[in-house]
C-alpha cells in the first residue's frame, strides 16, 4: 500500500534503536531517501533519519510489487515513511535490512539538488545556503551541530551542579549604556532602542540577589569587519559570581573548558564516523 499522507502512521523506532537481534520485528521508520538502486526484481533504498541510515530492500515475492516499483523510482531527498519487518543480513551495512509492507511518500523530489548529501565538502557557500536544510543533512555538519548541542548541555549541567541560577536578560535596551562595541539601533514602538551586546550590567545586579548566575544567549555587535568569519550575532556564555575574585573566576572558566573537552572527546570516541580529532 502506498499513501502520501501521514494520517495515523507514527514512527516506532529511530535507526539507532534497531539491530539484527530484532529479526522478525515489525517497525515503522521515517526519513529522507539517501540513495536508490535497482537490479531486476529487487530495489534497494537507503533512508537517513537524524541518527543514521537504514537499508530498505524490496524484493519480488517479499513485498507488494507496487512498493518495489515505487521505491525504484524515488529520487534522493524524498521524504518517506516505511513500515516493514526487520531481517538480519550480514551483507547490510548495519547487519539488518527492512522488508517493506507499507510505504508512504510524504514529499517527492522534482529537482535534484546541486550536491549529494554524502559530499564531505561543497565549495560554493551560495549553493549551500540555497538548499541549507539538505546541506545540513551531510554527515560532517550533523556531527558539528550535535557536538555544539552537547557542549552547551555540558556547560549548562556544570552551572546547575554548582548551584548557579540561569537568567534571561533583556535583548532590547533603551540606551547605549554598555560601551565598547557599536550597537545595532532598532525602532521599538516608534522609539529608538538597541540590541544588547552584553548582559554584564544585568548580571552584576542579579548577583546581589542570587550570588551565582549564568546566561547562554545571543549577543549583537555592530562592528564592521572585512572577514566573512566575523559574527555580528553570536551565542555568549556569561557567568557572574559574588564574593569571589579574578582568580576564582579564572578557575571556574578552566573547569568549564575541561568538562567541555571531556564531553567532546567522549563523543568522538562513541562516533568515529565524525572524523573529529580528540584533544589530548
Protein language model annotation of sequence segments:
Residues 1-280:
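Class II aminoacyl-tRNA synthetase catalytic cores and aaRS-like
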Amino acid at each position: 500500500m502506498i499513501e502520501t499522507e501521514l494520517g495515523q502512521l507514527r514512527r516506532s523506532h529511530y535507526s539507532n534503536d534497531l539491530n539484527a537481534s530484532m529479526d522478525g520485528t515489525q517497525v515503522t521508520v521515517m526519513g529522507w531517501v539517501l540513495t536508490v538502486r535497482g537490479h531486476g526484481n529487487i530495489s534497494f533504498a537507503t533512508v537517513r533519519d537524524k541518527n543514521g541510515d537504514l537499508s530498505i530492500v524490496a524484493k519480488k515475492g517479499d513485498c507488494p510489487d507496487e512498493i518495489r516499483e515505487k521505491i525504484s523510482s524515488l529520487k534522493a531527498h524524498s521524504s518517506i515513511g516505511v513500515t516493514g519487518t526487520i531481517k538480519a543480513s550480514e551483507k547490510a551495512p548495519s547487519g539488518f535490512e527492512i522488508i517493506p509492507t507499507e510505504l508512504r511518500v510524504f514529499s517527492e523530489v522534482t529537482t535534484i539538488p546541486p550536491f549529494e548529501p554524502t559530499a564531505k565538502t561543497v565549495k560554493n557557500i551560495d549553493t549551500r545556503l540555497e538548499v541549507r536544510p539538505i546541506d545540513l543533512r551531510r554527515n560532517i555538519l550533523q556531527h558539528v551541530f550535535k557536538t555544539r548541542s552537547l557542549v552547551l548541555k555540558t556547560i549548562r549541567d556544570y552551572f546547575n551542579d554548582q548551584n548557579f541560577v540561569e537568567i534571561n536578560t533583556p535583548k532590547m535596551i533603551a540606551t547605549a549604556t554598555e560601551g565598547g562595541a557599536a550597537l545595532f539601533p532598532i525602532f521599538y514602538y516608534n522609539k529608538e532602542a538597541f540590541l544588547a551586546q552584553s548582559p554584564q550590567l544585568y548580571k552584576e545586579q542579579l548577583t546581589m540577589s542570587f550570588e551565582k548566575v549564568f546566561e547562554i544567549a545571543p549577543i549583537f555587535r555592530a562592528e564592521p569587519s572585512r572577514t566573512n568569519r566575523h559574527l555580528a550575532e553570536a551565542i555568549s556564555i556569561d557567568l557572574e559570581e559574588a564574593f569571589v575574585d579574578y582568580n576564582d573566576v579564572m578557575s571556574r572558566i578552566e573547569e568549564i573548558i575541561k568538562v567541555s573537552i571531556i564531553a567532546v572527546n567522549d563523543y568522538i570516541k562513541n562516533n568515529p564516523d565524525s572524523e573529529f580529532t580528540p584533544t589530548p
